[in-house]
């Protein structure tokens, strides 16, 4: 079998439907035992002349799930929405609380995630 170049692969992917791509990603994850979870938030580059005083004000936060509460299934659903984890991974995260759900995200994203988790019945900490 001839080796396909990156351009050839991209051309093939362009012809696929979203459902076909989704099935491909699932098969790829199973074959190579990896996950294709997207990064939840990306921090912007730090300023070149960032002053040490800026360290006083925290701009990256972690959302820690401290407990699932009574509505564990709802919490698992919210964790999956926030992280793009699979069902098993999200369940393991919820069962293994306290665990970080999101790390190094902006204050707004951390607050929104914490609010969603609390609405589902989880106990959450933002650090």
Curated annotation (Swiss-Prot):
GO MF: mRNA binding; structural constituent of ribosome
CDD domains: Ribosomal_L7_L12
Positions of disulphide bridges: none
GO CC annotations, alphabetized: cytosolic large ribosomal subunit
Pfam family, one: Ribosomal_L12
Keyword NAD: no
Alphabetic keyword roster: Ribonucleoprotein, Ribosomal protein
GO biological process, one term: translation
Subunit structure, interactors included: Homodimer. Part of the ribosomal stalk of the 50S ribosomal subunit. Forms a multimeric L10(L12)X complex, where L10 forms an elongated spine to which 2 to 4 L12 dimers bind in a sequential fashion. Binds GTP-bound translation factors.
Its biological purpose: Forms part of the ribosomal stalk which helps the ribosome interact with GTP-bound translation factors. Is thus essential for accurate translation.
Assigned protein family: Belongs to the bacterial ribosomal protein bL12 family.
Protein name stated in the entry: Large ribosomal subunit protein bL12
Record organism: Streptomyces virginiae (Streptomyces cinnamonensis)
Gene: rplL
